[in-house]
C-alpha cells in the first residue's frame, strides 16, 4: 500500500525534516510554463549564472516514474504519448519491481542502484526497533548509501528532484542541486496532482536546466487505490491514465521545442503495478499472531498493503522458535500466498529493517493490520502480483536507439544507466546491484 495511511502508533519523519531553505540552501522563484509561480529549494550558489556554466556537458537525462502504472495500460489506447515514446526507444517488456513492491523502496533503488540490504528502505512502513513503533521510511538518513544524484553532484553536474509525494520529498532530502516541494498536497493522498508536478518539471528544466531530473507522477497510483468494481471509478482510473499521458506529452514536446531532445534520454518506468481486492478478501495477521501463546505480546506488524513485515520483539533466546511459529501462523492464514524467514531468504535482499518474516498476500487480496478495518483501500501493491512494470528508455540521444530486449530489467537498473550515460567512473562500494540498460 502506498497511500499514506498511518497505522496505530505510526510516525513519520516530517517533524525532523529540514525546512525548504537552510543555511546550505536558498529559495528560487520562477514562472512556470502555465503562468504558475514555482518555488525551488536550491543548493547555495547553484542559482547563479557562474554555477550554471560550471559544467558545460550538454547531455541530459530525465527519469519519469509513472507511479503504479501497469504495463498493459500503456497499450490501452489511453496513453498514446507513452506508447510512442516506448515504440521508438529501448523497451524491456519483462521489467519488474523488486521487494517490497512499494513506492519508497523502489524509488530509492532507482537512485542508488543497490538493493535495500545495502541501501536501506526495504518498505514503505517498518517497525523501528529503536523507537518501539511503526513508522514511514521518509527520513533522509533512511538511505544508507550514496545516490547517483550525489555522485553526479560531486562531479559538477546539476541535478533536480520533482517528486509528487510528500514522503518521497522527505526521503531524498537535500541531495539534489534543485528540488521542488510538492504543492498543493491533496488531503488524504499527500500528493500533488500531476498537472502541478509537470508544471514544476517543465519550469525546472527550462529555467534551471539540470543534467538529471528525477520526476514522480502520482495520479495513476492514487486513483488506483480506489475500488475499480464500479463503473464511475473505472472512469476515474482511465481519466488518470489519459491525463498523465498528456503531461508526459507536454514534457516531450518541451524537450523537442527547446532543442534538448537530441541530446537527452528519457527513462520511463513504474515503481510497481497495482492489484485490486474485494471487501471480503482481507488478511489481518495481528489477531492470529496475538492468539498464539508463544507470540502474544512478542510480535510487531508493519503493514504494506500486499506485504506484512513481522518482527519478533520477545526474548532473544526464543527468537528462532518465534520466527518458526510466525511462519506457521502466516502460512496457515487464508489469503496468504507465502511467508519467508527474512534472514534465511537471501534472495529477498531486504536487510534487518524488514524484520524477521516477510508475508505476501495472494492476488486479489490485501493485508490490513493491526485491525481488519485499518486498510480499507481496495487497490494495493507490495506483493508478487504487482511485480510487472513498464520500463523503457526514449529520447533523441543515440543511447536510446530503438530496440526490444528480453532482459529482466528492474528498478535498480536506473542508477547504473544514468551513471553510464554521463560517463561516471566507478561504482558504489561492492558494485552495482543493477546494470546499465543502454
Feature roles, as predicted:
Residues 62-63, 81, 243-285, 351, ...:
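Metal-dependent active-site segment of extracytoplasmic phospho-/sulfohydrolases and closely related
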Residues 302-417:
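Active-site neighborhoods of enzymes that stabilize oxyanions during catalysis
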Residues 166-184, 197-250, 282:
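Active-site His/acidic residue clusters
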Residues 19-29, 35-54:
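N-terminal twin-arginine translocation
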